[in-house]
């Protein structure tokens, strides 16, 4: 069973609250999400994000930092952003944030499995919100199914997990939306400044032409 089959009403509620909005721009064979790209470049997330040419994506609890491979190592931009969102959801559980992570929880433990569910479902929902659904739904479904198989499903477990997913994705989407709004406002200011400069140039040219006419004999 997967999460959608186990509690369809709760899954449906989360989906309804995360209606897709197109944020990707296709650039060649890759997709780009400019707000998230700026967050990475300017280090505007709650912890440092290192992009390196290597094969692993992970969040280090002890160092409170994320490491992800380069975008070019992925088949498309959607998969890369989905991987980044997975690790960013992990980072929301750090001490001083949502205090969800337990450093002593080793691979294979119930706590580890539950955190992977939070991160992967959170990633899938963030991707869905911004219109990235095609590739990630299949990957996420397989991921969620494998981890749910290692846990005893119960209504309380599913409910508390979804609550953590909602809290984590709220932090992530709120920051993305803030950066996106800042970029739009800056773009509007740039356009307004450009129009103002063009109007000034036109006015100067008109005044110059008028002066020349007055000087003619």
Language-model regions: role of each:
Residues 192-193, 197-198, 203-217:
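Non-Sec secretion/translocation targeting segments of pathogen effectors
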Residues 92-117, 138-144:
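Post-HEXXH active-site segment of zinc metalloproteases
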Residues 1-75:
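Contiguous, non-catalytic segments that form substrate-binding/exosite surfaces or channel walls
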Residues 66-72, 101-108, 147, 151:
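Glycine- and acidic
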Residues 82-95, 119:
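Active-site recognition of the HExxH zinc-binding catalytic motif
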Residues 77-81, 115:
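Alpha-helical scaffolds flanking conserved acidic
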Residues 116-126:
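Hydrophobic/aromatic-rich, well-ordered segments within soluble, folded domains that form packed cores
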Residues 111, 124-191:
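Long, well-structured alpha-helical subdomains associated
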């Amino acid at each position: 069973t997967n999460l959608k089959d186990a509690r369809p009403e709760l899954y449906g509620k989360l989906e309804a609250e995360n209606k897709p909005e197109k944020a990707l721009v296709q650039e060649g064979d890759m997709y780009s999400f400019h707000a998230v790209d700026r967050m990475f470049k300017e280090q505007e997330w709650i912890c440092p994000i290192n992009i390196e040419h290597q094969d692993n994506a992970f969040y280090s609890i002890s160092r409170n930092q994320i490491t992800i491979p380069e975008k070019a190592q992925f088949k498309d931009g959607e998969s890369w952003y989905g991987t980044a969102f997975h690790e960013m959801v992990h980072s929301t559980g750090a001490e001083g944030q949502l205090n969800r992570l337990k450093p002593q929880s080793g691979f294979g433990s119930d706590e580890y499995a539950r955190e992977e569910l939070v991160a992967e479902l959170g990633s899938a929902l963030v991707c869905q919100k911004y219109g990235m659904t095609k590739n990630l739904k299949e990957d996420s479904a397989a991921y969620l199914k494998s981890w749910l198989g290692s846990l005893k499903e119960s209504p309380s477990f599913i409910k508390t997990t979804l609550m953590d997913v909602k809290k984590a994705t709220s932090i992530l989407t709120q920051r993305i939306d803030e950066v996106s709004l800042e970029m739009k406002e800056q773009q509007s200011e740039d356009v307004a400044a450009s129009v103002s400069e063009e109007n000034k140039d036109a006015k100067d040219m008109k005044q110059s032409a008028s002066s020349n006419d007055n000087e003619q004999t």
